[in-house]
């Protein structure tokens, strides 16, 4: 690999580095050499991660070589009888021994990022370099690395952690016991770089625990990869035995570092948590006194006594009483108190700095006891004890000698907890607040001090966490990301001394990027997604028309980012109702960002597959969502990005209000903190910068960035955009008329395709086979040349190819507003709704797509273009039924997607066995096309009721299923319903199905009720 000398250090880079990469590596090396801190911004696509790894490891390798030479020289001097011989010889030997034990004093690197996917990406980059032989390890969670089958069966990460600890403590985990004997195995020690997947694979091969084995590699590793929380959370650092002295800390993707620092120091406790903890302690005490302890926890001696339990219960009762006594003046929004309230509440219950460690140890023992007992009886598994342990650990991590700073940096916010809010049997509560506070769990009635409360202990000073990190005697801290600007307020908030800072330009030429502010749509309606205008039907329509016009021009992938899930959902609903959704789908199939992990992966795969088609695809996502954070849309995957608005945090959210108030109170000329309003604006702009960074991913990439909100014309807003974006907008950015933008955009892509190096030719789409079923609707088909047998002529194949693209778009149509519930309005203890959940789909206006052959090619309307043979007819739930739709189009054939069903001529003597579609969306579409609207309405109603979980609802469901799907021709759909039932009902379902088949065989002509 080419070698470049940068800041006096030879750096091996996979290719000749560009100037921006040289500048970046120079800043990194200077920080490491001088032991100082740096804040470095380099746009996504400039090789930031590669430069970071090569520069830091080149410096480490140079230091290793220098120290090795020093030790060799010292050893030689000692042997030659030099100054180190004789009485001083022992000193030389001691120096060499200590040097070897500490890798000759060479610092180690800790590379931290937000997610494991980002860490895996960094490790893949490392494998491409000349430093791939340097020792590295990644630290992951038990959820990712545990291979014990019993532990992995547990639901919830906390349960897995506790059961793992229990098995290790009791020496019953054979995988962990093999670590000592297998840790030097060549398969484990051989590879220099092993990511999560590598560790799991080797662990399964050697039947050795990957989680504990990875910790064996840390001591000898030159670079350790880990997520942020392992590094910034003192509790996690202690659990993972992470030593930070003389360590180089690299925080990649650090644009969210302030929030992460704040959240790692924040915690929450509910009245219901304390109440359940009291119940759990009481239960254990009853077991002790009733002689059931052998059945519950075995006959081995306990690590705690009845006196311990009695004392703990008394403390919890006092804590419950103290929380109940807190007055909430405003039941809707809650009441804010100084940080001292949290220490007062705990003090009243005798939780103090002095006994904190002892109580935390007791709580951990109780958790392990309940994990054992839960194997023999139905009880909670100690989630509330874990929550209490986290509370005490975080609150008392703030030492008494810095309490004055704690009072400035923290606030206690108390709100009313819904009386009917039950945490369930698991009792597992998340101790740390995630994201902005949701207000869905606040009741609006009553101010009684006896009402259940939620007590939030919130940190608003990210510098508090960073200061604790610096106090561990680290050598250097480097914060880096593609979107850190503006740097001054970031440095001021983190309150760390920064010697090196950098704002790199982009690696691409000006001609490779087209950036415009679109302040008005094609109809000259102002585009502004503020609170007053976001419900304006004219605005929503104009935004849809803008996206439609851009989709006609942009080749391949088009990304559209919305400020929030509710706004995305609102637009989707409006466009579906008006027909704009169908118009956009004609140009490109549409994908919408789901919120479930599994659905997200499959949706992304479908999107990438759709990009191979000549039409490309549209992906609609949300700022701060998964798509905007770290995903790669290089080349054809993302040729343009549309930003539809500024994603401001909820203005009236208590946490937002308190953050703004904290900044206004503590802002001085000396500390250069942002004002509350500046922070509020910057939080939105940083999310925009992240979304923009999805499209330009490397030196030869090109794309367009369209800012579809007139507020981007404000100079204050533009100044917070990344430096390379500001260069394209100029000193006084102005919105351009829509017409000229369309012409310029078309010319930009035409010029780019002619002059820029294009990626490899896309794979040709496989022809769509056996998915179009022709139903005879009228006696005079519009295109008589289309035959029943698919693929027999070019015209049919062309229509076929178009149909599958539109079908992919249709899979999104049945998503509902509930699937995109606002993060600000979500109940704190409630899981986010699953956008792909089968039951949730039944609450929506399920759309049906008919593929009708165009009958008027010369009319210029009603199709996807003059050459298209497929048109879309959208039918809402309130629209006429299938029979009505058919009746109005008696001269056409209707092509309806029926997955995996081959079209064959009907036979009176035999009938082909059908199988229900595997996709839930396809299942619903096919069912709806075969039954009446009233039947489908009844079907949806009982399915929604079935979710409540009672046997009566199962009986109601079966009654409707037998009424709707009992006919022989519908039997395949009846059978297909089985996979959507809960496990406890599947056996009964099989009995009903067998009875149904038997009745049909005995009376083939009799209708089954």
From Swiss-Prot:
Keyword Mitochondrion in annotation: no
Cysteines joined through disulfide linkages: none
UniProt motif (DEAH box) ranges: 252-255
Residues binding ATP: 42-49
Keywords: 4Fe-4S, ATP-binding, DNA damage, DNA repair, DNA-binding, Helicase, Hydrolase, Iron, Iron-sulfur, Isomerase, Metal-binding, Nucleotide-binding, Nucleus
Localization, UniProt: Nucleus
HAMAP family: RTEL1 (MF_03065)
Protein name: Regulator of telomere elongation helicase 1 homolog
Source species of the chain: Drosophila persimilis (Fruit fly)
């Amino acid at each position: 690999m080419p070698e470049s000398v940068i800041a006096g250090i030879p750096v091996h880079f996979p290719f000749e580095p560009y100037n921006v990469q040289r500048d970046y590596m120079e800043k990194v090396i200077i920080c490491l050499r001088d032991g100082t801190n740096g804040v470095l911004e380099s746009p996504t696509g400039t090789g930031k991660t590669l430069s970071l790894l090569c520069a830091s490891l080149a410096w480490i390798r140079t230091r290793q070589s220098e120290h090795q030479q020093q030790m060799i020289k010292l050893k030689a001097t000692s042997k030659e009888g030099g100054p180190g011989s004789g009485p001083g010889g022992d000193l030389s030997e001691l120096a060499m021994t200590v040097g070897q034990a500490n890798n000759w004093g060479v610092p180690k690197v800790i590379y931290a990022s937000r997610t494991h996917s980002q860490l895996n990406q960094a490790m893949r980059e490392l494998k491409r370099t000349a430093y791939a032989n340097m020792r590295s390890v990644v630290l992951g969670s038990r959820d990712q690395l545990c291979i014990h089958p019993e532990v992995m069966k547990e639901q919830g990460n906390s349960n897995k952690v506790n059961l793992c600890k229990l098995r290790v403590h009791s020496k019953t985990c054979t995988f962990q016991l093999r670590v000592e004997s297998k840790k030097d195995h060549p398969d484990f020690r051989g590879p220099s770089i092993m990511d999560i997947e590598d560790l799991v694979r080797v662990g399964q091969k050697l039947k050795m625990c990957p989680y504990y084995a990875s910790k064996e590699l840390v001591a000898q590793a030159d670079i350790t990869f880990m997520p942020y929380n392992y590094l910034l959370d003192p509790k996690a650092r202690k659990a993972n035995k992470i030593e930070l002295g003389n360590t180089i800390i690299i925080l990649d993707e650090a644009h969210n570092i302030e929030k992460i620092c704040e959240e790692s120091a924040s915690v929450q406790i509910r009245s219901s948590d304390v109440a359940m903890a009291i119940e759990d302690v009481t239960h254990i005490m009853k077991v002790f006194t009733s002689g059931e302890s052998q059945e519950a926890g075995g006959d081995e001696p306990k690590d705690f006594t009845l006196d311990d339990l009695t004392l703990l219960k008394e403390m919890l009762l006092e804590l419950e009483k103290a929380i109940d006594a807190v007055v909430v003046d405003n039941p809707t929004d809650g009441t804010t108190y100084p940080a001292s309230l949290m220490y007062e509440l705990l003090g009243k219950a005798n939780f103090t700095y002095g006994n904190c460690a002892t109580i935390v140890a007791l709580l951990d023992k109780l958790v392990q006891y309940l994990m054992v007992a839960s194997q023999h009886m139905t009880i909670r598994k100690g989630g509330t004890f874990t929550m209490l342990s986290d509370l005490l650990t975080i609150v008392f991590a703030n030492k008494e000698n810095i309490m004055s700073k704690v009072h400035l940096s923290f606030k206690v916010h108390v709100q009313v907890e819904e009386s009917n809010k039950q945490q369930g049997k698991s009792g597992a509560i998340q101790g740390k607040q995630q994201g902005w506070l949701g207000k869905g769990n606040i009741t609006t009635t009553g101010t009684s001090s006896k009402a259940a409360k939620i007590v939030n202990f919130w940190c608003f000073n990210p510098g508090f966490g960073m200061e604790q990190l610096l106090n561990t005697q680290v050598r250097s801290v480097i914060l880096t990301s593609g979107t850190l600007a503006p740097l001054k307020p970031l440095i001021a908030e983190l309150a760390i001394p920064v010697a090196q800072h950098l704002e790199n330009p982009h690696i691409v030429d000006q001609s490779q990027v087209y950036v415009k502010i679109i302040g008005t749509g094609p109809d000259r309606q102002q585009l502004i997604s503020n609170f007053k205008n976001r419900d304006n039907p004219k605005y929503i329509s104009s935004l849809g028309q803008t996206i439609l016009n851009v989709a006609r021009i942009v080749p391949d992938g088009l990304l559209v980012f919305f400020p929030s899930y509710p706004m995305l959902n609102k637009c989707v609903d409006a466009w579906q109702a008006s027909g704009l959704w169908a118009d956009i789908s004609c140009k490109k199939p549409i994908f919408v960002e789901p919120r479930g992990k599994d659905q997200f992966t499959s949706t992304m795969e479908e999107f990438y597959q759709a990009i191979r088609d000549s039409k490309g695809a549209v992906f609609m996502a949300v700022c701060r969502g998964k798509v905007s954070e770290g995903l790669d849309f290089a080349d054809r995957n993302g040729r343009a990005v549309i930003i539809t608005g500024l994603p401001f945090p909820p203005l009236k959210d208590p946490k937002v209000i308190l953050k703004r108030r904290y900044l206004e109170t503590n802002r001085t000329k000396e500390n250069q903190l942002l004002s509350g309003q500046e922070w509020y604006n910057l939080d939105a702009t940083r999310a925009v910068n992240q979304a923009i960074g999805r499209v330009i991913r490397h030196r030869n990439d090109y794309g367009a960035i369209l800012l579809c909100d007139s507020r981007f014309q404000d100079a204050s807003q533009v100044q917070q955009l990344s430096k390379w974006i500001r260069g394209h907008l100029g000193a006084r950015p102005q919105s351009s008329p829509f017409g000229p933008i369309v012409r310029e955009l078309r010319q930009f892509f035409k010029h780019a395709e002619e002059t820029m190096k294009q990626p490899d030719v896309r794979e040709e789409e496989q022809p769509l086979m056996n998915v179009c079923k022709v139903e005879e609707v009228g006696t005079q088909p519009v295109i008589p040349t289309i035959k029943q047998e698919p693929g027999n002529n070019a015209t049919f194949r062309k229509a076929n190819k178009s149909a599958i693209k539109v079908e992919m778009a249709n899979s999104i149509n049945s998503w509902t507003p509930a699937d995109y519930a606002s993060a600000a309005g979500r109940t704190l203890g409630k899981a986010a709704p699953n956008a792909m959940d089968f039951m949730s789909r039944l609450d929506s206006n399920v759309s049906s797509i008919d593929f009708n052959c165009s009958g008027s090619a010369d009319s210029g309307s009603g199709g996807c273009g003059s050459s298209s043979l497929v048109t879309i007819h959208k039918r809402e739930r309130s629209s006429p039924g299938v029979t009505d739709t058919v009746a109005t189009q008696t001269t056409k054939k209707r092509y309806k997607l029926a997955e995996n069903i081959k079209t064959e001529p009907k036979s009176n003597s035999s009938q082909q066995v059908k199988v229900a579609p595997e996709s839930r969306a396809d299942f619903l579409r096919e069912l709806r096309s075969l039954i009446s609207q009233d039947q489908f309405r009844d079907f949806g109603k009982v399915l929604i009721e079935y979710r409540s979980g009672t046997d009566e609802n199962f009986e109601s469901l079966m009654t409707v299923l037998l009424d709707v799907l009992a006919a022989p021709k519908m039997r395949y759909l009846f059978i297909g319903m089985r996979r959507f039932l809960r496990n406890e009902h599947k056996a009964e379902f099989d009995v009903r199905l067998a009875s149904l088949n038997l009745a049909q065989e005995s009376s083939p002509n009799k209708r089954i009720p």
